[in-house]
Amino acid sequence: MAQPSILFSLTLIFLISIKSCDAKYRTSFFKTPNCSIYPDAEKCELNKTWTQEQVCDYVNCNDNACEGGGYLLWTQYVECASSTFSRVILIIVGVIYMLVLFIMVSSAADDFFSPSISSIVAHLRISESVAGVTFMAFGNGAPDVFGSIASVLSSPTPKADLALGELFGGGLFVTTMVVSTIILTSPFDVEVFSTIRDLLFYLVALSFLAFCFVFYNRVTLWMPLTFLGLYLLYVITVIGAQAVHNRKRKALQKQNSTKSRKSIKSLRSRKSIHSVAPMPVIPEIEVHDQEAPFPEISVVTGAIDKLKEHMAEKAQTTRRYTKRASFMVNGDGNLNGLHPYATHNHLGISRRESELSDEDEEFVVIHGHVFQGHEARSRAASLVPEPMQIKSWRSKDILKDLAEHLDPRPEAEDWEEMNIFSKVMAYINVVPNLLFKLTIPLNEMSWSKPLTLLHAFTCPAFLLFSIQFFLETPFSGSPGLWVYGLAVSIVLAILIMVFTELSVQPKYYKEIYSYSGFIMSIAWIYLISSEVVNVVTMLGVVSRVSHEVLGLTILAWSNSIGDLIADVSVVKQGYPRMAMAAAIGGPLFNLLMGFGLPFTIAKLQGKYISMTINPTYRLLILFLAISLLATLIGIPVQKFRLQRPHAAVLISIYIAFIVFVILSETGVLVWN
């Protein structure tokens, strides 16, 4: 177990040394540039007449504009290379590095981020739609929002169009390509109110920004404050709608219980009058309501119990459960629905009534599988091994326990089901998975006190490292923030040592690991996204593609890869409505907070923020509005079920946008 720790430590030291020794690096490996002839640039714009040495000096002097904010300075590496061969090799290595990062962010989203989201949603007992526009939106949008904050606060004279360009570009990509991917993966019935609500809020925010660009040439304080207020109104609307939904659900439950009692009384009455032979005992399902308890509900036939037994047997071999295959209860133990045949044919509950409760069905994700319905938690928990019985710290079981929890290889059962491509990806992902397990608490694993102690030190350190605050000093004469992080780690370690036992799982272990795993997953996604942006920025500088086109295309794609991976992962788990809510609510969150928060801070700092709109951004706002209107109109046209033809429409809109941008950049399309 020493080797993984050494590998992780060396990786951290290497990356930190690269970042902290940035200034020394320029003087050691390259000729010290004369930055006085290269004033601070807001965009990385290279003159075609410059020599390679001048280009190298320029990118060294303007690393804030020519780099993406990650640790590895790819633009400097390539532009300051000693030969063309070295440049080509560095570009190839950079592309390979970016592909590995894509694999890493996919693993982080699928294996760590999604399970944490699922557990948090189950713990808070919130619906798919609320989860999509809060936790998933924050998780997906963290790189974009933090990127917007960094770009605005790092410049003495920030420009609104540059900061919003990537937010708009990412929003268009998500509302067209990501939404279409969700639909192609699994056509689904739309959660009408929440989806239309999100689309309308998005259109209002977009219209307000267009108004500001047309009638103002600078940002004033009331503009970002309006966006923050709009987001607050949005959150209130979401919570209010959920409260109304819960009241309707409880009223429906009482109505259904009354119908059930009447049906049972009628059935027993007919039995006592007309029965000739003894009737078989009718299996019963007892349901309790906290506010209004009602008598037991008997199902007319034994089909439900047989189906439940069959699904339980199937679960022992496949660990998969059909979404509506069993009797379902929500977190409070209330009746949500029965098997469709029993529900519709025997209890007289309409399809619309049964769908009313679908949104609140309890679900738990364990080891990549969704468990939903009655006893979802107990079924899921059955897959989580019990804590290893470790008698003392001197036991060899300590190392064995750590080895099992940190094992980066896929489980034997999953390995047998993989195809060749998946196995290759699994091999590539061995080292990233080890790093993830060292720094991301995973609530699917059994309790391990040694691992928890290790996380107490690795998580605070990596959190500071991921946001590049590891060596920052909060005030003059203060040590780096890593010292304060170490102090926090020591306190956590003492608490763990005193208040937990080796072989007994603490009471709130799952909840704490879910929330901390959520935060650390976001930290990894943010770090990986920054590194991807660095490589993409290098490709743009090398190819001399304009900043606008780069931001609206390649940067938008790379920044949105987390949205695509996370949303598709949720769809495959059987929750397309949550993914749809995140696909619309995520970019909406990014726009409202990505404009509202950083520009409010910048205006409070007294900065002047210009607002100009060029032809490329006009196209972007236009096509983003078209994509939102297409979905808004397409929902009722398709009878509230998004199907594959709608995905084709969204893809066509995005392709048309790319074509118009190319025509505008090449001068074929001229704006008056």
Curated annotation (Swiss-Prot):
One of its GO terms (biological process) is intracellular calcium ion homeostasis. Gene3D superfamilies: NCX, central ion-binding region (1.20.1420.30). InterPro entries: CaCA_antiporter, NaCa_Exmemb, NCX_ion-bd_dom_sf. The keyword Aminoacyl-tRNA synthetase does not apply. Residues 1-23 form the signal peptide. GO terms for cellular component: membrane. Keywords: Antiport, Calcium, Calcium transport, Ion transport, Membrane, Signal, Sodium, Sodium transport, Transmembrane, Transmembrane helix, Transport. It comes from the Eukaryota. It comes from Caenorhabditis elegans. Pfam families: Na_Ca_ex (PF01699). It is found in: Membrane. Belongs to the Ca(2+):cation antiporter (CaCA) (TC 2.A.19) family. The chain crosses the membrane at residues 88-108, 130-150, 164-184, 196-216, 221-241, 451-471, 479-499, 522-542, 551-571, 581-601, 620-640, 649-669. This is Putative sodium/calcium exchanger 7. GO terms for molecular function: calcium:sodium antiporter activity. It is a multi-pass membrane protein.
